[in-house]
């Protein structure tokens, strides 16, 4: 496995900027795949039927073929924004103010 240096704040900002409101992906899985590919993962996009009414994009990634198996499940989608005027900053701006990152998903699986 390769080592890679990356900025976790930059990664979080990249993900928050993706307006991935369920069931839309809006590029979030591409951001994840690019980072996983950089450390040697093989990434495979998958599409499932969500409740037979919409498609749900997923990403299956593997690295190596020896040792014990480890599985990690996460998500990059967020619930709808609601009243955008209630937000201090636009919900997908990934704005940093006074050392805090603001945006949809910044305190969930996007961080």
Model region roles, listed by residue range:
Residues 109-111:
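Short, intrinsically disordered, charge-balanced linker/junction segments flanking boundaries
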Residues 2-107:
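Acidic/His- and Gly-rich active-site-bordering loop/insert found
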